[in-house]
Amino acid sequence: TVMLYGQLEVPEGITERQKMRARAKRNRQRARTRILALSVMGVELVSTLVCFGLYFTGTGVSNYPKGTTYTASVIRYMYEREDDNLFFRAETTHSQTLNDGALNGYNGISAFTSSANVRVTEFMRALGYGAKNTYNRYCFEESSPVANLFLGIKYMIERDGKDKSSTYFDEVNRFGVASLLVNTAYLPLGFLTEPELADLDFSAGNGTFQFQNDLFTAATGIDEEVWHKLQGENLAITGNGADITESNSTGYCKYSGCVSGANVTYTYTADRDGFVCVHLNLPKRNDFYVSVNGVELYKETISLPQMIAVGDVKTGDTIDIRVECDKDESSTMTLSAAVLNGERFARGYEILSASRLNLTRFRSTLVEGTVDCDRDGLLYTSVPQNGNWSVKVDGKPAEIRL
């Protein structure tokens, strides 16, 4: 928006009193213009919040970042550990805002920006994160170890005082309620994959476990599913103060007649050991609680379909996802849970980590490095492509295929 301020012309021969009145009139016009501009900005901000369904409560200086000085200490320690590393990414287990990385000075994933690259948005949606190609944002939540492979996530920051260590993240330090976790299956900005990865259509991906199975196979060449779904006899859907009018063994549920305090609970029984994630599609943007064997892990709210991490489980463990419903609410929801095959994942990680991109120079417009290839393949990088990047291999131009 461009605003033009008019210049006041004062005729010759008028009195000083008339000049003062003219200046006062000009100042009133400017004040009205400023008020109008602020009103337009306010309306635009409210419209943005409504249109994009942001579910972040108001954040003031006193409670940002979550964990305050403890979180600042964790971030400082993280960079001390990585003093010789030219680039890596970090994220929080649960977002406080969509621009936590930019606000706290680390390279993150979540973003809310008017210049969001639609291809990156589609890529994030395909990996199971909260994203939509008509929105200008995407949100990282602690999720799938498979997705983390392709994002260069080396660290996660936990800010609620909880123990978030698992098979795939080790706690390396703690300051008060904030802790730093390192990815035990970390892959850097670039690494060698199988050529078939270039044929995978990320724009058609919808964040499901099946897409991640296809992604894992295309990248590693391991033609076995890395995710095993919990469904059929391993799933029970119950309504508490809500009438379940339709459901199936794969996680679809239709409900109505909700009373105050109603909920729909999905109970999964693990039929094997492993790391569990859940994919949720909640059109009503409900609050939900995640519990294992009756112990509540966390509460969350999402505004778009998203995959989230539950954690390590043992055979026979029960995972409850309790979805809260408003009074008189009626809608549908679809949830699915799956257990990661640790042995297959480890084999795939070994293949992908064999030939890594070792950075020698890094700037916002230049990435240089070396790769000691153990085979022919496709060099994958998690550099967001905006049409301005070009690639050279051994000094010769190379095709960007993905």
Annotate each predicted stretch with a short phrase.
Residues T1-N240, N286-D287, L304-K327:
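Conserved luminal/periplasmic juxtamembrane motif of membrane-embedded glycan-processing enzymes
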Residues N234-L402:
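Active-site-proximal, structured, solvent-exposed surfaces of multi-pass membrane proteins
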